[in-house]
Each structure stands twice: as structure tokens, then as C-alpha cells.
């Protein structure tokens, strides 16, 4: 916990602040996370700070300086200062200078993972081990740190070594989702490269909420595709109880990173597409498209299912869910002016499909290409105007009726949730304008991250079987992370070693 955690009384209200309630969808994500980039380059912290400050001083972007509070009814609201000062900064910025030592001499950070070019690899140590060494000692961490202290939404911490730099951005998920964070990084990079005129217009919480207009005057929303599979009260309690039971008897779980050589993924995808074409000779080859990410979702779910202990019963339902961004659909509906905007808010929804465990593991398992095709079809189905309207309406109705979001499937199902960050091109973010002079003199053309650590606070009860596809490096290696039980990790590692 950071220094902020000690205080429990909220700061007094400043009369000149602009007060705005949080949007419905944003209130669903009351937790914080760190997003750390590791460079094997020396970057200038002041250049980075000045560029970030330039972005946040722009029209609209100053909203990121808002403070978080609860009103008299315990509803969340933003308090946006009229002016920022040293006492009430626009963003938190801290540095940690270790330029007299190499990152290779740091007792923990010298273990930053590097891909194995020959086979898939699960890396040690766990993400939580790196996290505490990549953030500021007094950086906000828990949700209450923002509620009970007069601090802005964004904290940036820079750690400098003689041969490396770590940039950690800490923020609340109530502020925005992954693509909102990527909009900030894009604006930051454009500013560093002197291309501020290309920064997309900002839309934030002071603007009209595009999700509030989703129904577009309809008296009754469309029916959600899985509406008939919503579990009732007892099914929901059963799902929660099974999770708690698993956490109680198997307390050891961790978020860990694993890498897949580019050639391995290429072979996996080529094989999957060939299987799909063979299964559907009536289709044109171009109509049998599945992306690398579709294939990885299906393949990794199979690994998770077959390495559970005790084994999943063949008939047990597996729910494979992809979190997808709705900004394109909102623009299509005219609720956002275009896709080229910096929309700060949460706009991710679920694209799911259900299959028995036997489809992923065992003698009767389906071919990878067919499972990947189900991933693709579920995304195509859910990323429609009708199904976005239906899912959003179901969220709001269930939250008002039960206090929680709806759960679809069965109370004893295995849920595997994926977040695909590939679209953000994280490993292609070039911070070269911030290189110090000695680095530029070496003729370096780019400064790209070699490792990305995206984490939040973990507890014994944190969700399991959740996976992120972090992206593809310049060398072609794929980076992923997943939170699994320790015994499942051990079996997957053994399987990787046999490859």
C-alpha cells in the first residue's frame, strides 16, 4: 500500500471544483492498475514529464486531473479543479534514480523475462514480484487511496538505470479502459515526436455519455443472444461459492507471463486455418479466416482446461469470453463523431460462446481451427448494434435488480476470460525522442519496450483463468499473461518443456 492509504477522512470539498457524477459503466470498475514499460535504453525523465504535461494541459485532457469522491448517497463523482498547482497537481510524477547501476545488478529486475526463441516458455517470477519494484514507494495503489486523498487520476513513475528505463503509469479503471489508456500513450508519443497536431480530439466524462444513448429511443431493447441462459440467484451463488472453494483449497495462484516464438504461433495458425477450410469445403478460403488471436484464445483455453485437477468433467460447460471494444460500433451509430477520437471511458463488452470441456480436451476434442472459428463468430455476433444494445440493457437491468451484472451459462461452468491488447501495438511504441544524448550518439533509431507488466492488486480471491494477449514484439515473439493456480502452471510448464 502507498503512503496515501493511511488517511481515511476525505479531503474537504473545494467550492470552485466542477463536480460530475461517474457514468454507469465506469462505476463498474472500482480498482486501479499499473502499466509498466521496460526499455533497454536510457530515457530522459524530464523530456518524458514535459511531454506528458503538454498532453494533459490540452483542452479536455485536463479532466484527468480530477479528484475522486463519494457524494452523500455514496455515489462516485469527480471533483475537477479550476486551476492546478504544486499543492493540487494535474498529475503525479516521481522518479527513482539508479543511474550508477545496471538493471542487471538489481536483485529482482535483473530477472525481467526474455523470450526463448525455441519453444513456449512460462517465465519466473510472477508479475506481483516485479510490480512492487516498478512503482513509486508512495504511489496510490488501492481504490481508497484516491477517495481519501486529494490526488489526480494519473500517476507516472520513472526508474532510471545506467542501461535501462522503466515507465509506470498508475490509474483507476473507473477513468478508462485499455483503449483509453492507449489514447494517452498515443498522444504522449505524438508529442514526443513533435506531431501534436495529430492528437485525436478528446471526449471524456464532461461530454455526453455515448453509452447512455445506445437504445436510440427504443421502447424495448433487443433480446440478448444468451438471455435464456442467464443463471438465477442460486446459480449465481453456486458460481461464487465454487470460486471461493477453489481459492480456499488452492490458495496458491499467480499472474505470470509466457512467451510463444513467432514461428510456433505461425504454425499453430496455419494448421488451424487448414482445419477450418477442410471442414467447410463449401466456403471460399478467404471466408475461413481466423486471426492469430482467435487461435491463441482457443489453444490456451484448451491448455487451461486439460491441466485442471481434478479434471473437468467432459460435460462441464466452458465459457470462453473475449472482452471487445465498442468504440467502432458507437461511431457507426453516430454516438461518437468518428473512430479517430480519444474517448476516455469504459466501453468494453463481452463476446462469449459455450462449449463442453470435452471440446477442448480429451479424445473427442474439436479441432483447433473449429474452436478458433467459434471465437471469431462470437466476436462478429456481439460486435453488432443490436447485440451491443441488448448486452448494455441487460447489464443495467441486472445491476438495478440484483446489485450485480448478469451471469450467463451454468453455476458450475469454467469461465475463461481474455483481453486482447494486440490492437494497441504495445511493443511498437517508440520513445526514441526521449533518449539521452549518449544513447543517440550510438546511432539508435528506436526505443521500444522489451517487457510490459500490466498488474493490479492481487488477493487470494482474485479471478482465475483470466488471460491477456499483450502483443507481438519486433522479433516476432508473442507475449501473454494469465492468472492460474500454481499446480496448473506446473503442469503447463511441463507440457511446454516437452514441446
Swiss-Prot record:
Source superkingdom: Eukaryota
Any GO CC annotation of this UniProt entry: nucleus
GO terms, biological process: antibiotic biosynthetic process
Keywords in alphabetical order: Antibiotic biosynthesis, Nucleus, Transcription, Transcription regulation
Primary localization class, coarse: nucleus
Record pathway: Antibiotic biosynthesis
Cell location: Nucleus
Function in brief: Transcriptional regulator; part of the gene cluster that mediates the biosynthesis of sordarin and hypoxysordarin, glycoside antibiotics with a unique tetracyclic diterpene aglycone structure. First, the geranylgeranyl diphosphate synthase sdnC constructs GGDP from farnesyl diphosphate and isopentenyl diphosphate. The diterpene cyclase sdnA then catalyzes the cyclization of GGDP to afford cycloaraneosene.
Protein name, entry field: Transcriptional regulator sdnM
Naturally occurring in which organism (per UniProt): Sordaria araneosa
The encoding gene: sdnM
Amino acid at each position: 500500500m502507498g503512503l496515501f492509504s493511511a488517511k481515511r477522512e476525505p479531503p474537504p470539498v473545494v467550492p470552485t471544483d466542477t463536480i460530475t457524477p461517474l457514468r454507469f459503466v465506469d462505476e463498474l470498475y472500482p480498482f486501479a492498475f499499473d502499466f509498466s514499460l521496460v526499455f533497454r535504453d536510457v530515457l530522459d525523465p524530464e523530456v518524458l514529464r514535459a511531454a506528458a504535461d503538454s498532453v494533459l494541459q490540452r483542452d479536455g485532457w485536463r479532466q484527468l486531473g480530477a479528484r475522486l469522491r463519494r457524494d452523500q448517497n455514496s455515489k462516485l463523482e469527480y471533483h475537477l479543479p479550476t486551476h492546478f498547482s504544486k499543492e493540487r497537481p494535474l498529475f503525479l510524477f516521481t522518479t527513482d534514480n539508479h543511474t550508477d547501476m545496471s538493471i542487471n545488478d538489481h536483485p529482482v529486475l535483473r530477472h525481467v523475462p526474455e523470450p526463448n526463441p525455441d519453444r513456449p516458455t512460462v517465465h519466473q517470477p510472477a508479475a506481483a514480484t516485479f510490480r512492487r519494484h516498478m512503482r513509486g514507494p508512495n504511489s496510490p495503489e488501492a481504490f481508497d487511496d484516491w477517495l481519501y486523498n486529494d490526488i489526480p487520476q494519473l500517476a507516472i513513475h520513472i526508474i532510471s538505470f545506467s542501461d535501462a528505463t522503466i515507465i509506470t503509469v498508475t490509474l483507476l479503471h473507473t477513468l478508462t479502459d485499455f483503449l483509453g489508456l492507449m489514447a494517452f500513450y498515443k498522444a504522449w508519443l505524438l508529442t514526443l515526436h513533435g506531431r501534436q497536431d495529430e492528437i485525436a480530439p478528446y471526449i471524456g466524462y464532461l461530454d455526453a455519455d455515448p453509452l447512455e444513448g445506445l437504445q436510440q429511443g427504443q421502447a424495448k431493447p433487443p433480446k440478448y443472444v444468451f438471455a435464456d441462459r442467464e443463471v438465477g440467484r442460486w446459480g449465481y451463488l453456486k458460481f461464487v461459492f465454487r470460486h471461493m472453494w477453489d481459492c480456499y483449497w488452492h490458495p496458491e495462484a499467480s499472474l505470470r507471463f509466457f512467451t510463444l516464438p513467432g514461428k510456433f504461433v505461425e504454425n499453430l495458425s496455419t494448421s488451424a486455418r487448414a482445419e477450418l477450410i477442410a471442414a467447410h469445403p463449401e466456403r471460399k478460403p478467404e471466408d475461413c479466416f481466423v486471426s492469430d488471436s482467435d487461435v491463441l484464445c482457443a489453444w490456451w483455453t484448451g491448455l487451461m482446461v486439460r491441466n485442471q485437477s481434478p479434471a473437468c468433467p467432459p460435460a462441464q460447460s466452458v465459457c470462453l469470453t473475449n472482452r471487445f471494444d465498442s468504440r467502432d460500433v458507437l461511431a457507426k451509430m453516430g454516438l461518437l463523431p468518428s473512430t479517430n477520437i480519444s474517448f476516455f471511458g469504459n466501453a468494453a463488452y463481452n463476446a462469449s460462446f459455450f462449449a463442453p470441456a470435452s471440446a477442448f480436451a480429451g479424445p473427442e476434442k474439436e479441432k483447433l481451427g473449429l474452436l478458433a472459428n467459434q471465437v471469431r463468430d462470437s466476436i462478429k455476433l456481439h460486435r453488432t448494434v443490436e447485440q451491443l444494445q441488448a448486452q448494455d440493457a441487460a447489464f443495467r437491468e441486472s445491476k438495478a435488480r440484483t446489485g450485480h451484472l448478469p451471469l450467463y451459462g451454468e453455476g458450475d461452468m469454467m469461465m475463461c476470460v481474455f483481453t486482447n491488447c494486440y490492437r494497441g501495438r504495445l511493443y511498437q511504441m517508440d520513445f526514441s525522442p526521449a533518449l539521452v544524448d549518449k544513447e543517440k550518439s550510438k546511432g539508435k533509431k528506436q526505443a521500444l519496450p522489451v517487457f510490459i507488466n500490466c498488474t493490479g492488486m492481487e488477493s487470494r480471491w482474485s479471478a482465475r483463468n483470466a488471460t491477456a494477449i499483450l502483443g507481438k514484439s519486433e522479433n516476432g515473439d508473442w507475449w501473454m499473461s494469465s492468472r492460474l493456480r500454481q499446480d496448473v502452471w506446473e503442469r503447463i510448464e511441463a507440457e511446454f518443456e516437452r514441446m
